Amino acid sequence: MSDNVLLHLGEEPRFDQIKTEDIKPALQTAIAEAREQIAAIKAQTHTDWANTVEKLTDITERVGRIWSVVSHLNSVVDTPELRAVYNELMPEITIFFTEIGQDIELYNRFKIIKNSAEFDTLSPAQQTKLNHDLRDFVLSGAELPPEQQAELAQLQTEGAQLGAKFAQNIQDATDAFGIYFDDAAPLAGIPEDSIAMFAAAAQSEGKTGYKIGLQIPHYLAVIQYADNRELREQIYRAYVTRASELADEGKFDNTANVEQTLANALKTAKLLGFKNYAELSLATKMADTPEQVLNFLHDLARRAKPFAEKDFAEIKAFARESLNIEDPQSWDLSYAAEKLRQAKYAFSETEVKKYFPISKVLAGLFAQIKKLYGIELAEKTVPVWHKDVRYFELKQDGQTIGGVYMDLYAREGKRGGAWMDGYKSRRRFADGTLQLPTAYLVCNFTPPVGDKEARLSHDEIITLFHETGHGLHHLLTQVDEVGVSGINGVEWDAVELPSQFMENFVWEYDVLAQMSSHEETGAVLPKELFDKMHAAKNFQRGMFLVRQMEFALFDMEIYHQEDEGRLKEWPQILDKVRQEVAVTQPPAYNRFALSFSHIFAGGYAAGYYSYAWAEVLSADAYAAFEESDDVAETGRRFWKEVLAVGGSRSAAESFKAFRGREPSLDALLRHSGFDNAA
């Protein structure tokens, strides 16, 4: 067991030496040792910060880090063997952390510290962590009688398993699909680099011709560019019926998972004394009540809908007059929008993409980080889980302050979407030594083909900056308590502030120019082309925003239900939301909710509104840079008041410290082109 690398992870895990067969013994050994150490804490006659809170942090961090690596690998290099052990261990890890959260002896010891003279001697970050811990004990059921604790533990274990199964069904359904073409004739209109990607996908299976899958670069290439309407409809139908009863003979159908997840969430909330799961979700967020969130979303939807109606009318007219599509359907909208954008603003996304090789984009991203915060990134060779992964150290005045893994390209066996997660968090130990934070930054960009460098679309650059914003939030923390350093302890509806804030810089010409180099001439992005892009920034913005309101309202409404008998009515709730906010209705076979992993497998249950909520904060925060002539000084202030403090104080306090006032909706409305909306 001593040679099991998962028991000795260190600063950077030896990913090249991790064996699937080592996972189970490592985790079970770590959990067994942890339980012995927790028993020792409870056997002590004296209780203080060092021998209780600090010691428990040591214990949980070790187990949590092992599971973090396993969970990460399950997301990025899924294999049948890895998935089997992951699913087998999911209940064990859930039970372990549930036991801690429900341990009345530990809870009482934490209360002793809160009520002791020592509490006043703790740092503000330590006090915040202790208060969060006490809250989390209550939300884990520490105050419940034993029989209800057991019921809650069972619900939490089942909930974790349901989320994992939901995500795995989506991945399996995505990877199971493929259509093949012998020649490129049916692919007319699709950009050359995407056609090369289809050819590479076929070659990877030992086939000639072209393979189109449902990974997001494949889907977008067809739905946005393919002149072949039948192909667009075929790919659209396959994409929106993933993980449903309408695809793969129902083998990956998530319908039961959705209904069981909703029932599980409601039972959990009621056991803890809440009327519904939305109330429980908001217990750890900035927003106070579900009604406050619903009012916020309805207000934004009301403001956006007139613009969405105008957007849709413009697309319908253009499709009819210029594309000979009399009645545009869901699979026509992205295609027609791209053609309209080209006609209206005289540029295409394909043209833009030619300017952004990944090497220049990363160099430009790093230059912007240095400009804002004085931080440099330097590549370092470390063990990784896939040949495409790169690792960078963050340096301040030559000193390493953190590190980030970047896994940027789509591939089979990798979960879709983009995300940032932490491997470890900043922490100062009792002896004064400092543990540095490390993050994973994962995207699903169009991969390079052959010896050609990958090139990013402007949307992909926005995604990269977004996830980097999350990463910087985790890595630039200056808090020494692991429970509130970086993104830890930050309210979920504020966690998107740093990520959405970073997106704004991708709309500055100087930023884009320094990361551009045309694939043929090496020329930088022309100002004329940028001006066209900027003019088109809010193109179809109304349609986009009402779609986001549809997602967020659906999420909040289904988790706001108090009657278990009505939980199966979620399709009707979605229809009702669409009737209120949407300007176009999808076909009856659309099963979007069955792949809505954010709210059924990704931690955003009764929390998807966070994107819009945090966009108010991020637009207002960026406005400080628009108002300032000194970007570096404003960047240092944003670092100090928002990024550095992590979860050690409330997000509302951090925002007010940066802006000097409460957040305002004005900047978001202005950036969205809605500032003249009533």
Protein language model regions, located:
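C-terminal, non-catalytic "cap/extension" segments appended to globular domains
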Residues: 1-22, 29, 188-189, 197, ...
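N-terminal helix-rich structural modules
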Residues: 1-190, 625
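Short His/Asp/Glu-rich catalytic/ion-coordination signatures at enzyme active sites or charged loops
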Residues: 7-22, 70-89, 112-154, 213-256, ...
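Short, surface-exposed loop/turn segments at secondary-structure junctions
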Residues: 42-53, 76-80, 248-251, 280, ...
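Short, hydrophobic/amphipathic alpha-helical patches that form generic packing surfaces
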Residues: 61-72, 135, 237, 333-341, ...
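Active-site-proximal, well-structured secondary-structure segments within enzyme catalytic domains
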Residues: 129, 161, 168, 173-213, ...
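Short pre-active-site segment immediately N-terminal to the catalytic Zn-binding motif
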Residues: 446-465
